[in-house]
Amino acid sequence: MSERTELIRKLGSSKFNYWFGYAANISLVIWLCSHGIAGGKSRLTPGQWIGWSAVGFFSWTLSEFLLHRYVYHLWESFLSEGHALHHRTPRALIGVPWYLTAIALWAVFEALCLVTRPQITGVVMGFNWLGYILYCIAHHGSHHWSLRWNWFKRMQRHHLIHHAHPECNWGFTTPIWDYLFGTDFDRRRAPATAKPTQ
């Protein structure tokens, strides 16, 4: 194991980092969404809250696909090394160090606030990050839980296929992007196994 990979393993695989990351991320969601409130009053209308939170939550699904495909698999970085470590030891508690996540999220927020209103940016990013937290819970569950819910079983199967075939199934909680971009394992395999028509 290279020195860099060993450092990544040490930074990202402590139980404290893994579990505290959830608390830190929930705090980030609250901090981001608090920009939609000032002096105890909402800075957005109820319709804006609903609309912008939906945009944020939906944007997570595409963010998840793009991060997983490019940052974790195609581009070489400490994040891709950490993700490769996860592929080798899928049940290990490995996560991006919580403080790096917080710094990155703060920097993106500040940059976006240069071109948008902070209350909108905060709500969109807050609900985007809520999607990330739900993804983390579902991802953990796919490797550690055995639930009988059909949705969970489909999601788990989709993800475990990705571990066996890392070139596909990059969308995890929402495989719709794999369908749209042609990276779904079942759809890629279907033409090869389909019987010719008469």
Segment roles from a protein language model:
Residues M1-Y132, E167-Q198:
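Non-catalytic, topology-defining segments of multipass membrane proteins
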Residues H86-H87, H159-H162:
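Detector for the Zn2+-coordinating histidines of canonical Cys2His2
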Residues L134, W151-L160:
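Functionally important transmembrane alpha-helices
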Residues S142-K153:
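Interfacial helix-loop-helix junctions of multi-pass membrane proteins
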Residues S146, A164, F185:
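Flexible loop residues that form catalytic
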